[in-house]
Each structure stands twice: as C-alpha cells, then as structure tokens.
UniProtKB/Swiss-Prot annotation:
This is Arabinose import ATP-binding protein AraG. PANTHER family: ARABINOSE IMPORT ATP-BINDING PROTEIN ARAG, CARBOHYDRATE TRANSPORT ATP-BINDING PROTEIN MG119-RELATED. Gene3D superfamilies: P-loop containing nucleotide triphosphate hydrolases. GO terms for molecular function: ABC-type L-arabinose transporter activity; ATP binding; ATP hydrolysis activity. Its EC number is 7.5.2.12. It catalyses: L-arabinose(out) + ATP + H2O = L-arabinose(in) + ADP + phosphate + H(+). It holds the Pfam family ABC_tran.
Length: 507
C-alpha cells in the first residue's frame, strides 16, 4: 500500500536501513545502512561505480530500492516517486541540474506552485516571492532573467533556492563543483555551511579531496555497492587513509610517472589564431612526450583543442605533423591525420548515451573497415569491443550495456578504447579525469604513460595543478587566450604555475 506523505518539518537524522538495488545483471547496492545527523555535512565517498549516485537517486525517488527503507526522524519511507521524496522534505541537487533553461528564474523556482489570481498567473506576486527566495543566497540574480542566460554556478544557486522554497530538511549534492570556477566554489561552500548551521542534513558527493576536508563533518565510504566504513570525525582521517579505504589498496604514486626518451618531432603549431585565442599560439610536442596545458577557466585551452581537432576553423597560423604541412577543415581531417580528441564534456561530446559500450567503442573505427562485408565487419566489431574493454579495464556487465549507465571513469576509458582502435599520432585529452575517482584516475594516468611509451604525443589540458605537474614532461601555461609561460617538469611548482595563469593587466 502506498503510504501517505505530507510536507514535513522533521528535524531528525536521515537513516538508510538495509538498502539494496539490483539492475539487470548488476547488483548496484547491497545492504547499505548508515546514519547522517542533522547539523552536519556527511560525505559519500567511493570509486566510480561504488553506488553513491544510485543511493542519491533512491533518496530522491528516481529509483525504488529492491530492499530496505529510508528513515527521516521517526518516519520510515519507501519513495515511489520524486514527488513523494520532495513532500518528505528531501532535495537532491544532481550534477545535471533539473531546471528549464527557456523559462525565467522565477518560473523555475515556483514551477507547479505559481501564485494565481482569477485563474491567471500573478506575475507580480511570482517575482516578489522569487526575490524573497533568492535573498541572501543570490541577490544579484534578477527573477525575470531567462535561466539559460545564467552561469552554471548561478543556475546551481537557483536549484538550491528551489530546494529552500520546499522547506527541504535533507539536501543532497551530487558532484556540485565539477564545472564551477574557484570563486563559485567558495560561494557554494559558504552556502553549504549556512545550511548545515540551520540544522539540516547535508549529503555531499565529490571526488575532490580538498572539498571533503574543507566542508564535511563525517564520511561514509562505499566500494562495489557495499558499505565499507563511516568516519564520524574528520580528525580521524587523512588523505592517504581515505584513498586506501576507497580503493581497497595503498596508492603510493597515483601519477605513475616514469622518464621516457622522446622520439623526434610530432606536431608543430606556429602562429595559430582562431575563436578564443587572443594572441598567436606557437608550440611543438614530440613523439613520446606528455605535454601539459595549465590555466584557469577561460584561459583558451579548450578553444585551442577545438582548433587542433578541426571542430573550429583557424583564422591564421600553420600546423605541421611529422614535418609535413597539415590543414584541418573538419574533425574528419583531424581523425584521418591521427589527431584524436577526448573532449572535456564526455557526456555531451564524447559518448552516444543510448548506444551500447561496444557501439561507442567502434564509432571511430568503422570507416577503416567498411569494405569487410557485413559478417566479417560484425565479428571484427565484437572482437574489437571486447579487446578494448579488457585492455582498458572498462567495468561493464556486458559490451551491450548502454554506456550511459557506466560511471564517468569507465565512460572515459571506453572513449580511450575507441581511439586505440584507430591509427593515432597525437592524443588530445581535455580534463581527462574530471569527475573521476582516485582509482580510475590512476588507471587513466597509466594509459597515458603507456601511450607515450609507444611513441604517441599526448597533450593534456588539466585544471588540477597536482595532476598536470604529476604526469607531464613539460607544461605550457595559458591565460586569456595566450601562452604565458613554459616550464620543464623539474622546474614547475604550484606558485610559478599560478603566477603564469593569473590574468595579466592589459595596456
């Protein structure tokens, strides 16, 4: 029987009691039990695929558990829908925000609860109410603004204000800072502390260790869909202990760096200009070299990669590959030349979500085998997919599993497997480990170093200072669409890189 759920102002703890969830061929969660206290920020940690997001979807009513119950205060629940979860005082703020870009901020905030008069929406009252909800949270946002015109950080604040409008006692954040600037992250941290101090239960999922130690009061660790341990006091934890608990092994050197012999010139860029580049860009990378690009948001690194992969057209400059002139008019030109891109936004640009893992791996490889005949082509694709899944250690119940159900780390490894099916000379990796857990990061770093050892020129864009210093042979720094410095591995440190990355005063 479906239980009646009413709007609650319960101020009790959130308890998960024996939660289990099974998908076809996969046991996503097994007997999860722990408690998150009011007035605390409780982190959920674990490798990709550990079950954190599945648990939040059960909390939010998107998934129904096969076993177990939720408890808020003294009331037990088994949510059958998101509406039931919301009515119980729960708000889940997902990585992909559930807002309508074409509507105004006010319409998004009050969707389903708009004030009306004589059967018509009372827009004056709607804007006033929206302004009240934004006050102290995002005072600079005009409720009349179209939501799609806001920055991602501002949209996230609107999502939080929406949760507040429903008097949410339990608020869960799923990777909330993955695409935010440093200033937006600072603002979000302050808001989370404020929500905690108001006595709410805050669940926080992030792969960024510095955020966990900055804002969280307790940590629960998951592995392979199972509860591992809850640390009730952050004083009991340090970075190494938490990583070991998450991955089940001690990772001494996550970056796996080892010196390599470079094998001669690969790609040379001279005087390149195009959208997002404000000064001519020139650099060269050698075969077997890992070249890092560091910079702050808006530095022009992603725009440079779009030019090098043929996604946008240059307005000036020349390219040489293996000493020969190269002209890129389209992504096909780049792929045929052996310059392959793993994009920053893998969900939108890197994968076909509704297609299988095998189909995603074989997308790039098909043009080389169109004349094999249907039977041989099909056999080759099956064998290639299985081979890449094995070599990349992609965790999937089957090659036919839709790739959208894989963790971020496994999606990234599948994309790398796609390019390994093709002739490759230069690999462009744009934020390759964003939103990926420590264990999967270590695997991707190992793949990068193995490719370099095979003579591939690997160019990595990363906003993670430790990462770019840890894996690169040489680092170029960009700021405001220009290269501002070059450092060899042994001379790079955080201070020098940040100084080069800061915007310059233009005359």
């Amino acid at each position: 029987m479906q239980q009646a759920i009413e709007q609650t102002s319960i101020n009790g703890a959130l308890r998960f009691n024996g939660i289990g969830k099974v998908f076809p061929g996969v046991k996503a969660l097994s007997d999860i039990s722990f408690e998150a206290r009011p007035g605390s920020v409780h982190a959920l940690m674990g490798e990709n695929g550990a079950g954190k997001s599945t648990l939040l979807k059960i909390l939010g009513g998107s998934y129904q558990p096969n076993s177990g119950t939720l408890q808020i205060g003294e009331q037990s629940y088994q949510f059958k829908s998101t509406a039931e979860s919301i009515a119980a005082g729960v708000a889940v703020i997902h990585q992909e925000l559930h807002l309508v870009p074409e509507m105004t901020v006010a319409e998004n905030l009050l969707l389903g609860h708009m004030p009306n008069r004589f059967g018509l929406i009372n827009r004056g009252a709607m804007y006033r109410r929206a302004g009240e909800l934004l006050k102290g949270l995002a005072d600079e946002i005009d409720p009349r603004t179209r939501l799609g015109d806001l920055s991602l950080g501002q949209r996230q604040l609107v999502e939080i204000a929406k949760a507040m409008s429903r008097n949410a006692h339990v608020i869960a954040f799923d990777e909330p800072t993955s695409s935010l600037s440093a200033r937006e992250i600072d603002r979000l941290m302050a808001i989370i502390v404020r929500l905690r101090d108001e006595g709410r239960v805050i669940l926080y999922v992030s792969h960024r260790m510095e955020e966990i130690f900055r804002v969280c009061d307790a940590v629960t660790v998951f592995k392979d869909g199972r509860f591992v341990k809850t640390f009730e006091q952050m004083a009991d934890l340090d970075h190494d202990r938490l990583v070991t608990c998450m991955v089940g092994r001690d990772i001494q050197n996550i970056y796996n760096y080892r010196p390599r012999q470079h094998q001669g010139p690969s790609l040379r860029v001279t005087g390149l200009l195009g959208p997002g580049l404000h000064e001519p860009v020139s650099f060269a990378v050698e075969k077997g070299e890992v070249l890092g690009f560091f910079g702050l948001v808006g530095a022009g690194r992603t725009e440079l990669f779009r030019l090098l992969s043929g996604l946008t057209r240059s307005t000036a400059g020349t390219l040489q590959l293996d000493g020969k002139p190269l002209t890129l008019k389209s992504p096909r030109d780049s792929i045929e030349a052996g310059i392959l891109l793993c994009p920053e936004d893998r969900k939108k640009e890197g994968i076909v979500p509704l297609s299988s893992v095998a189909e995603n791996i074989n997308i790039g490889a098909r043009p080389r085998h169109v004349n094999l005949g249907c039977l041989i082509q099909g056999r080759w694709e099956r064998d290639n997919a299985r081979s890449q899944i094995k070599s990349m250690n992609v965790k999937t119940p089957s090659p036919e599993q839709q790739i959208m159900f894989l963790s971020g780390g496994n999606q990234q490894k599948a994309i790398l497997g796609r390019w390994l099916s093709m002739p490759m000379k230069v690999l462009l990796l744009d934020e390759p480990t964003r939103g990926i857990d420590v264990g999967a990061k270590s695997e991707i770093y190992e793949i990068i170093h193995n490719l370099a050892a095979d003579g591939i020129a690997v160019i990595v864009v990363s906003s993670d200072l430790m990462e770019v210093m840890g894996i690169s042979d040489r680092i170029l720094v960009m700021s405001e669409g220009a290269i501002t410095g070059e450092l060899n591995r042994d001379e790079a440190d955080e201070s020098r890189l940040l100084q080069l990355a800061l915007p310059r005063t233009r005359s």
